[in-house]
Amino acid sequence: MDDVYDMYRRGTELLEAGHHHQAAVPLARARDLAPDKTSVREALGRALFHIQRYEQAADEFRAVIERAPTNDFALFCLGRCLQMMGRHADARHPLALAACLQPSRRDYRVYRDRARARAADPPAS
């Protein structure tokens, strides 16, 4: 399993089967060997999100966005990571961009609106 594609394929198979922890292993190896592959980094970000490693997942989605700034899914996922970390004000921008890029995606609009509302009304301390 030395080939990046084989590691990516194995990781995505595990990811699709719901084995998120296991998927992160070959996907991280593939990322280390081919850090410029946005498909690998997006899949790794998804796996990390599912295992609640939101900061690391956000880093992967940022790397995708650096190379593909109009990747609506990566923008959406970055926004969701930021929301899960309680950073609703920071989540507004990527979620708004994702919703603009794909206006037919209701889920993008729902999470964009939630981030806006939470950022405007922070929890009481």
Give the label of every model feature segment.
Residues E16-A17, H50, M84, A117-D121:
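Register position in tetratricopeptide repeats
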